[in-house]
Amino acid sequence: MSGPNGDLGMPVEAGAEGEEDGFGEAEYAAINSMLDQINSCLDHLEEKNDHLHARLQELLESNRQTRLEFQQQLGEAPSDASP
């Protein structure tokens, strides 16, 4: 019978005997190191995302201000044009 990855299934007794053949300290250290790298990359992406979000908020506020100024200028233009 094959396992989930297509490997031949190991009897329970053999798995218990071969416990030492499982993940060793070096494998756990390597996995831990990879997880640390992934975590570091995710932290970096989160920082970039936060920075972009802040910049977009600034741009949105700037565009709102510019739109309000244009609307005010258009509303005031007829009264400024008369002598």
Curated annotation (Swiss-Prot):
Where is the chain membrane-spanning? none
Q: Where in the cell is it found?
A: Cell junction; Cytoplasm, Cytoskeleton
Q: What GO biological process terms does the UniProt entry carry, in alphabetical order?
A: apoptotic signaling pathway; bone development; bone resorption; gene expression; intermediate filament bundle assembly; multinuclear osteoclast differentiation
Q: Which UniProt keywords apply?
A: Cell junction, Coiled coil, Cytoplasm, Cytoskeleton, Phosphoprotein
Q: Which InterPro entries match?
A: BBLN_eukaryota
Coiled-coil residue windows: 25-74
Pfam families under this entry?
UPF0184 (PF03670)
Q: Which GO terms describe its cellular component?
A: anchoring junction; cell junction; cytoplasm; intermediate filament; subapical part of cell
Q: What is its main location?
A: other
Q: Per the record, which residues fall in region Disordered?
A: 1-24
Sites where Phosphoserine occurs are at: 82
Similarity-based family: Belongs to the UPF0184 (EST00098) family.
Q: What is this protein called?
A: Bublin coiled-coil protein
Whose protein is this, by species?
Homo sapiens (Human)
Q: Which gene codes for it?
A: BBLN
